[in-house]
């Protein structure tokens, strides 16, 4: 397995790095939403990597090595020596199609030797919970499923995904990796701090929360925020909600919007009736430690060739100028010889624990690592 990384901007074109892996089968392009001349970029990539599938994904910030960029295209070309890949592209027009899209992905890519799926979904229409439900219920639990929801610089209005085309709205792309030669690992952690008592969801509809402990959820949330309540909905990124599963594992949910008239809160993932939840708040040190813990979960894969980092846009907003510290924590744990790429997202897809069904996450650092047997890093 060989990789190379090049960076392209509208103003300067390509950086000074030279393309060497012309026989790549896959190129991942994480791209800012304001990058212009994408047709020129697409033409250049097709010429340089004629045999590769070119997968585009818009971002809320591009990750290249140890840097966070804006309005660039971070292009990572990958040549697999012994691993077949297969790609499924599907269009989604309405949120209600999310589960059927997941089923279609699973049916298209399922095979006896399927080792892993990496999903890049548009990030505003798709209900990530139902998307992963459709996938989970139609592939073996031994298949690792990871990925993320495209970003749009924190606007939550329209994201763009594509394969062998200029990225466009309403597209989901899934990549299947096959055979025994590919080794994949994952890690996902948040690092948020809980505050207040554990409460029960007493009224919700999919991703809309109405009441907690039979009381108005929005009013309760505002009481917790105090003076910060005047900054809603923007301040909500600093105070997500934690769903506590029966086994003690946690899912973090970002608040996307509030409805003052209905007293409701809309989240970036489902909030099931009867679930136990707790409010959370930002702690800079814990967020950075969470990134390091996500990297530590990948320890089973020694010196991976490639690491794809998908971190939530909310983490970037909270960490501000300290955001690169979470990248430093990951690199220190995994190693400097690994090639790193990724993006800041509207949601992350990863199992909660090793080799259990994948789930939608918010506000996490999610890492997927790859290597082929026999890879030796320079």
Regions inferred by a protein language model and the residue ranges of each:
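Small-residue-enriched flexible segments
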Residues: 1-48, 52-53, 57-320, 324-335, ...
